Amino acid sequence: MSQDYYQILGVSKTANSADLKKAYHKLAKQYHPDNAAAGDTNAEKKFKEINAAYEVLKDEQKRAAYDRFGHDAFQNQQARGGAGSQGGHPFGADINDIFGDFFSDFMGGGGRRKPTSSKVRGSDLKYNLTINLEEAFHGVEKNISFSSEVKCDTCHGSGSEKGETTTTCDACGGVGATRVQQGFFMIEQTCHKCQGNGQIIKNPCKKCHGLGRYHKQRNLSVNIPAGVENGTRIRHPGEGEAGIRGGNNGDLYVDIAIKPHDIYKVDGANLHCKLPISFVNAALGGEVAVPVIEGGKVNLTIPAGTQNGDQLRLCGKGMSKIRSTIRGDMLAHVHVEVPKNLSKRQRELLEELRGESANEKENDGSFFNKMKSLWS
């Protein structure tokens, strides 16, 4: 068995990247051709071995492959992959090509890139849809209109005239790419003849010009489920743009925006509203009819002594929830209204009430009396 890369660098198999780098720099400096004696071929050979070892071990993926398959297997693959290459690369071939073939052979591949398909998946589309709060509560079906690429109905997405077939590109052998030698490296580039498709259409469809799709205005009915929230995204599989030359369609994403409501403010599944009541109802209590999101009104009990800013809750009268029979609550925020214009009789009654209230305050040592005593 030949000396492996760890032995060449003089490090253990558990060496970290810092140890590898330190060992490499030390040895590279020692055996660099500029520092070697004239005619010392051993130094040049050693220098190449050091570079080859470091090129593999400094790369985590390549090092993992080397550790897994062993030095001899790697060397055998190098011998096959390096035949006919030029440029004086330490491995005699592009390191990426070597490892590409290396993995292919061990995983059952043949070292050749598989032919590419000319089919390309269509792009996804996004549509912004605005609905009102009632529609969000009940759910709604909406008709939307948008422009997109659709499958050609003449060639049925193939890109060829009726009855015509595609042929494999003779420039790239159907892989969609060709390789060009540039210095030490083998560069892969898109095939100029088939534009990366791997196939040649000899007689393109006149309607879609060989793409298998064309631009069209579309109308689509979309279902918005009850309980959607502002910002909900709904996916419609296969309703995006048609693929190229028979490729799969993309998806359509509908983003929901809910318009602000005149009465309600939304907080998750709960609804908040302002509830104006008279100061008489606030003091004495009673019932008021309040509108609800599903339509109509329900009676809400006002407890006696309700204060301005109090919250009154109607359980189960909020928004729907997606895939649930449970609803949120409605919270009414009390706003006590004080009349600005009083009749003579109303004024007399309030004056009478004020007199009685003053007597009560004096007897119970109220806050107002305590304040009064501070200033007396």
Swiss-Prot record:
Protein's cellular compartments: Cytoplasm
Gene3D superfamilies: DnaJ domain, Heat shock protein DnaJ, cysteine-rich domain, Urease metallochaperone UreE, N-terminal domain
One annotated GO molecular function: heat shock protein binding
Necessary cofactors: Zn(2+)
One Pfam family per UniProt: DnaJ_C
All residue ranges annotated as the J domain in the record: 4-70
Family: Belongs to the DnaJ family.
Protein name, per record: Chaperone protein DnaJ
Organism lineage: Bacteria, Pseudomonadati, Pseudomonadota, Alphaproteobacteria, Rickettsiales
